[in-house]
Amino acid sequence: MKYINRRLTIEKISLQKIANKFGTPFYSYSYSKLKENINNFKKSFRSFSPLICFAVKSNTNVNIIREIKKFGLGADVVSVGELMMALKAGINPSKIVFSGVGKTTSEISFAIDKKILLINAESLSEIKEINRIAKSKNKRIKIGVRLNPNTDAKTLSQISTGKKENKFGVNKNTFYEIINYCKNSKNIDLKCLSVHIGSQILDHRPYEKMLKAVSQILNKTNHKFEFIDLGGGMGITYTDKNKKLNYKKYNTAILKFLRKHKVKIIFEPGRSIIGDTGTLVSKIIYIKAVSYTHLTLPTIPTV
């Protein structure tokens, strides 16, 4: 956003004019910024042509997803609602990955029927349920398993997901148990190892540590994975404009990893694609005086 003639604008359009026409509150998104973010991400990792699946959880607006789809991106979903939204936006099912810790039987069944690329499981019990459902449909499907690499993302504890005390993923012992189970299962094909260590990460070093942990795990098994899903978590700057994730160094670490392991990389960016493209615009309707300060009360609904 920029000020033009003392008016705050987005894409050179006055936010005041938009408010006058449509009322408030509303979300306003910059298409040029969205395009810039996507192209920058694709360019940064073009050396190995990853599958980029937009994390729908970061923005479920079907019109936004539809625009993102035009750049060739797939979708990462964590619920049947997000899956339906991705399909409605025109995302090819062969580019959709279904993640998340609490998939229901009906959600798994729906995902199988839609022939999406992968269902990333979070536990052995979930894999057994996926296998049961696939067997009932007489289908063989591709799945992934999320590994907890015990890697500190150096981010807020509330959004850290890759340490051993976090609820996400399975530990090493369970991971090897899952591999053995899948080898003896006719209806599931374990194709992907998935990791995701946290959100709002601005330092490339936790990613390097994560890749080393994954490499060590792969070296201890003869199972052939087709995909390594590195998740997302790439942060954006809110206050310190000089602190940005170094994509170049992350790319270098991945290339080093790929020299040892011949796999297809999947990314699940969300915030890094959409986070700085939109603005919530509201109107101040009241000013309330309290001790030592004043509160402005905007017209933003709570639902």
Predicted segment positions?
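Conserved anion-binding
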Residues: 126-185
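Conserved radical SAM core fold
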Residues: 61-64, 82-84, 104-107, 149-164, ...
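C-terminal active-site-proximal or functional interface alpha/beta core segments in diverse enzymes
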Residues: 197-295
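Single conserved hydrophobic/aromatic residue that forms the stacking wall/gate
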Residues: 294-303
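Glycine-rich tight-turn/loop motif centered on a GG-T
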Residues: 23-25, 113-118, 157-169, 203-205, ...
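Gly/Ser/Thr-enriched, mixed-charge loops and adjacent short helices
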Residues: 177, 183-202, 206
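Non-cysteine beta-strand/loop elements that form the S-adenosyl-L-methionine
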Residues: 78-81, 99-103, 142-156, 190-195, ...
